[in-house]
Amino acid sequence: MKTEMYRIVFSNDAKKDLKELSKKAPQAVKKLSKLLEEIQEHPRTGTGQVERLKGYDGNVYSRRITHEHKLVYRIYDEVIEVLVLSAFGHYKK
């Protein structure tokens, strides 16, 4: 039985981060795309040093895009959705 894929949604901050990432670290965009594909199937496990972040409420995780940039996202299991919070630099609240 195939599980349902998580829908990826971007916060306004994450949309800005994607623009910055494509300008300043275009090689990282390809890696980010692969991470997002993986997150659609299994958001809590996989590549990129998956880590649940303790300083946030709920299911907030991070994955390494590069040594300089982290992908931070919140998982909403009840609606099968992942909200990307940031994708440029390190953690932001």
What spans do the regions from the language model cover?
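Enriched for short, Lys/Arg-rich terminal
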Residues: 1-7, 15-30, 63-70, 74-93
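Residues that recognize and position ribonucleotide moieties
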Residues: 7-8, 46
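Generic recognition of well-ordered alpha-helical segments
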Residues: 16, 34-37
